[in-house]
Amino acid sequence: MGFGTLVAIGVIVFAVVVITIILCLTCSCCCLYKACRRPQPVVTTTTATTVVHAPYPQQQGVPPSYPAAPYQGYQPVAIQPQPGMPVAPYPAQYPPPYPMQPPDPPAYHETVAAGAGAPYPISQPPYNPAYMDPQKPTY
């Protein structure tokens, strides 16, 4: 046997082993499939947290050095415009929406029917190779 034959046999054996493992892992009757698909035991640990709600110690009274009345709560105040700040009137009607895309240029048959003619000025002469400058000789 030559070296090339041994390499070919090795490649074939390797391919057969890989294909066999893939087929065995996908076939439900194979022992490798059952071993890989066996449900893993789920370990659950439960920890209980107990929260104790203790009331905050209340003050017995207002200290004598604090002459102000106790806080009575939030009193909302209407917002008034400041001088120098213009107040915009409420719009009676919303403006029309902007178009989503710019309009397309008119089709060719629409421009011809409207008499617009060519889209370029007619004063431009047509291309004429006779008017080209002769090539200058290179040195």
From Swiss-Prot:
Name recorded for this polypeptide: Protein shisa-5
InterPro entries hit by this protein: Shisa (IPR026910)
The function of this protein is: Can induce apoptosis in a caspase-dependent manner and plays a role in p53/TP53-dependent apoptosis.
Q: Which organism is it from?
A: Gallus gallus
- Which domain of life does the protein's organism represent? Eukaryota
* Keyword terms: Apoptosis, Endoplasmic reticulum, Membrane, Nucleus, Transmembrane, Transmembrane helix
**Which compartments does it reside in?**
Endoplasmic reticulum membrane; Nucleus membrane
Question: What's written under domain?
Answer: The proline-rich region is required for endoplasmic reticulum localization.
Quick one: which gene encodes this? Shisa5
Can you tell me which family this protein belongs to? Belongs to the shisa family.
- Span-the-membrane segments of this chain are 3-23
